[in-house]
Amino acid sequence: MLATSNRFERRKRRVRLKLKNNLSLLRLSIFKSNRHFYVQLIDDSCGKTYAAASTLEREVIALAHRRVNSNSVKIVAKLMSERLNKLDNCKKFVFDRGPYKYIGVVAEFANELRSYGFEF
C-alpha cells in the first residue's frame, strides 16, 4: 500500500511540475474517488475557482444513480461545458489529471469536454 501511495504522489508531483510552466492558462483539475468525480477550473495566479461540477449535483444523481462511470462523467462534462461557456474567453486551459492515469473515466471526461470545443 505504501508503494502505491508513493507512486501516486510522484505522478502527481510530476504532472504539476509540467503544469507550472503554463501559469498564464487556467487549470482544470479533477479528483475522483470510488463514488464521485469532481472537476474545478482554477486560476493559480490568484487562487480563485471559477467553475466546478461533480457527481454530487442533482442533475447527475438523478441520471447516474451515484456511480462513477462513463455515463456520469459525460453528464459532468456537459454541466462543466455549460458553466465554462458562461465565462468569457475560457476555451483554452491546462488539464490537470493529478495522480490519475489518462485512461477510463479520466480520458472519457477529457474527450467529452474536447467534443464541446475546448482545447487543452
UniProtKB/Swiss-Prot annotation:
Subunit structure: Part of the 50S ribosomal subunit; part of the 5S rRNA/L5/L18/L25 subcomplex. Contacts the 5S and 23S rRNAs.
Protein name (Swiss-Prot/TrEMBL): Large ribosomal subunit protein uL18
SUPFAM superfamilies, alphabetized: Translational machinery components
Transmembrane intervals: none
A Pfam entry, by short name: Ribosomal_L18p
Function: This is one of the proteins that bind and probably mediate the attachment of the 5S RNA into the large ribosomal subunit, where it forms part of the central protuberance.
Highest taxon of the lineage: Bacteria
Family: Belongs to the universal ribosomal protein uL18 family.
InterPro entries: Ribosomal_uL18_bac-type, Ribosomal_uL18_bac/euk
Organism of origin: Ehrlichia ruminantium (strain Gardel)
GO biological process: translation
Alphabetical UniProt keywords: Ribonucleoprotein, Ribosomal protein, RNA-binding, rRNA-binding
GO function terms (MF aspect): 5S rRNA binding; structural constituent of ribosome
